[in-house]
Curated annotation (Swiss-Prot):
This is 2-succinyl-5-enolpyruvyl-6-hydroxy-3-cyclohexene-1-carboxylate synthase. It comes from Salmonella paratyphi B (strain ATCC BAA-1250 / SPB7). InterPro entries: MenaQ_synth_MenD (IPR004433), MenD_middle (IPR032264), THDP-binding (IPR029061), Thiamin_PyroP_enz_TPP-bd_dom (IPR012001), TPP_enzyme_TPP-bd (IPR011766). Transmembrane segments: none annotated. It comes from the Bacteria. Catalyzes the thiamine diphosphate-dependent decarboxylation of 2-oxoglutarate and the subsequent addition of the resulting succinic semialdehyde-thiamine pyrophosphate anion to isochorismate to yield 2-succinyl-5-enolpyruvyl-6-hydroxy-3-cyclohexene-1-carboxylate (SEPHCHC). Its cofactor is Mg(2+); Mn(2+); thiamine diphosphate. GO terms for molecular function: 2-succinyl-5-enolpyruvyl-6-hydroxy-3-cyclohexene-1-carboxylic-acid synthase activity; magnesium ion binding; manganese ion binding; thiamine pyrophosphate binding. Keywords: Magnesium, Manganese, Menaquinone biosynthesis, Metal-binding, Thiamine pyrophosphate, Transferase. Homodimer. Its EC number is 2.2.1.9.
Amino acid sequence: MSVSAFNRRWAAVILEALTRHGVRHVCIAPGSRSTPLTLAAAENPAFIHHTHFDERGLGHLALGLAKVSQQPVAVIVTSGTAVANLYPALIEAGLTGEKLILLTADRPPELIDCGANQAIRQAGMFASHPSQTLSLPRPTQDIPARWLVSTIDNALAMLHAGALHINCPFAEPLYGDMNDTGLVWQQRLGDWWQDEKPWLREARRLASDKQRDWFFWRQKRGVVVAGRMSAEEGKKVAQWAQTLGWPLIGDVLSQTGQPLPCADLWLGNAKAVTELQQAQIVVQLGSSLTGKRLLQWQATCEPEEYWVIDNIEGRLDPAHHRGRRLVAKIADWLELHPAEKRKPWCVEIPRLAELAWQRVVAQRDTFGEAQLAHRIRDYLPEQGQLFVGNSLVVRLIDALSQLPAGYPVYSNRGASGIDGLLSTAAGVQRASAKSTLAIVGDLSALYDLNALALLRQVSAPFVLIVVNNNGGQIFSLLPTPQSKRERFYLMPQNVHFDHAAAMFNLRYHRPENWEELESALAGAWRTPATTVIELVVNDTDGAQTLQQLLAQVSHL
């Protein structure tokens, strides 16, 4: 009997089972213990393979692939701390709903807790963060193949959102030629190998329950808050709110076109807050809100009803309103709850939104990061997509820009970390094959610098704008101690990214004005390659511009 041959047959059943649940992308890191899984994936023609030497980046690459494909994405890593490096991406997926299937190779039980090399306690190591966890036994012919395939099917059928962690112990030897070991065991699955359906099919439909009193509430004064959603959903929500005559407060990730732009500015005006107090119902579609003033208003508003609609299960209202938590796909929910055409009830807010926009436009000629955030819609590739980093840049775009309705926008706004942003953006581009504009800060770029390796081969033009304000300038907006701010919060690194781009053979520009930036972008969109554009800006100008605009708009 060949242990290595049966390991591979066992792994082949696992990987083939994944294909029956829509898995097409498999992300693989190098490793020895994961050899059975890696070879099974490599030999299965249903998969598109992605490789990366850094497991943390690999997990985020899978996250980006899942964001766009809307299908589960598999990740294969070896044992030990390689597994732990998947934690950040796993946590993000749990908060934003992307489906990740983490196949983690492990030592067999007799090598755990006895001093064996690269052997850690992997079973359950992710605590409550995976949506589902499955610890498989060591491969043995004593367990029928139908148990293995049905167990995988059951776990995937139960996976509504987030990550499934499948821990896979394998004994040595891990290498060797294939022989007939386990062939009969494998063939007992019969014509399943030629089929395309799961062995075990479980029905689990996410149904949208119609709110029977909607006809009553849609005649009231309402407010629509749009959080993270798809581009198609964003367009539908915008039309729905317009028909109702309700003001729409659109997040940067809502893709609604933000018909009342600069919400994070005008929500700081007492007149706007006073008018919003007249709302009898607030309907929030999508979660993960960005704007600070929006979150402050959300925390203090007291409508008669506050509804939150999102296809992710669980509590998504940090203000704990009295109302309804409705688990449904946004498009399906809108179809069940049609709008009734009514005149807009808000008068002051549209006026304030227009005045706030004019204040922002008046400052657009200055070369800086706040102005870049405002101008970003002018630099979007045609029929492309935008990936927005975290920290200051996403807040500036949310507050100062107005993105086109239905234009795809992606970000990691679950745990909102700056780790893995370049890797996630790489996954977004690979899954869509669209021209992609990604914008991050300098610390975010440094944090995930080796992800530039993932950007060496792209299927469409990819532009990475690194806004270099020399540190974490988000802390300039916070009441951090002035004497400790630079050393312990901002942490300026005084670096540039030309050498990093050169190391990975990527095109590089450092424009010093808008004309040079636009020229660099024009050339980049004509070439199916990655271009790194570094915007070196004054350290605190972005934060100061936002604070100045907030003060101006608050007194309108």
